[in-house]
Curated annotation (Swiss-Prot):
Family note: Belongs to the ATPase epsilon chain family.
Tagged with keyword Membrane: yes
Function: Produces ATP from ADP in the presence of a proton gradient across the membrane.
Gene Ontology molecular function, alphabetical: ATP binding; proton-transporting ATP synthase activity, rotational mechanism
Name of the protein in its database record: ATP synthase epsilon chain
Subunit-level organization: F-type ATPases have 2 components, CF(1) - the catalytic core - and CF(0) - the membrane proton channel. CF(1) has five subunits: alpha(3), beta(3), gamma(1), delta(1), epsilon(1). CF(0) has three main subunits: a, b and c.
Lineage summary: Bacteria, Bacillati, Bacillota, Bacilli, Bacillales
Organism of provenance: Bacillus velezensis (strain DSM 23117 / BGSC 10A6 / LMG 26770 / FZB42)
Keywords from the UniProt entry: ATP synthesis, Cell membrane, CF(1), Hydrogen ion transport, Ion transport, Membrane, Transport
HAMAP family registered for this protein in UniProt: ATP_synth_epsil_bac
CDD domains, A to Z: F1-ATPase_delta
Length: 132
C-alpha cells in the first residue's frame, strides 16, 4: 500500500515521524482525511486528535492547534503542543482538567474565561487520546 511521510513538529522539536497510509485531522474548516498523493493544502488546525493509520492500525496524537501542510508525498503538522497517546501523562492531564474546571466554576472578574475554556479543551483532548 502507498504511504505518505508524516511529521508532527512543535517548538520543542519533533513528536512523530513515520510513513503512514492515511492521516485524519480536525481543521478549522472541518475534518480532513489525507491519503498519499493528496493535493497541496495548508489549513489551520483545531485542538483535537490526529489519527494516523499505519500497517492497518490507528495511532493517535493530541495536538493543541497549529497548522497542517500537505504535499503529495509529505504531511507536516506544525503544532503549538503535541503528544503521542503513549507519551501523555494522564495524571498531569487530569490535574490540568480539574484546574480548568475550577477556574470556570469559580468565575471572578479577573478570570480569563476563554483561556480557561481552551485549557479545558486541551486537557480533555489529551485524556481522550490517552484513552481515559
Amino acid at each position: 500500500m502507498k504511504t505518505v511521510k508524516v511529521n508532527i513538529v512543535t517548538p520543542d522539536g519533533p513528536v512523530y515521524d513515520a510513513d503512514i497510509e492515511m492521516v485524519s485531522v480536525r481543521a478549522e474548516s472541518g475534518d480532513l482525511g489525507i491519503l498519499p498523493g493528496h493535493i497541496p493544502t495548508v489549513a489551520p488546525l483545531k485542538i483535537g486528535a490526529v489519527r494516523l493509520k499505519k500497517d492497518g492500525q490507528t495511532e493517535l496524537a493530541a495536538v493543541s492547534g497549529g497548522f497542517l501542510e500537505v504535499r503529495p508525498d509529505q504531511v507536516t503538522i506544525l503544532a503549538q503542543a503535541a503528544e503521542t497517546a503513549e507519551s501523555i501523562d494522564k495524571e498531569r492531564a487530569l490535574a490540568a482538567k480539574k484546574r480548568a474546571e475550577d477556574r470556570l466554576n469559580k468565575r471572578s472578574d479577573d478570570t480569563d474565561i476563554r483561556r480557561a475554556e481552551l485549557a479545558l479543551q486541551r486537557a480533555v483532548n489529551r485524556l481522550d487520546v490517552a484513552g481515559n
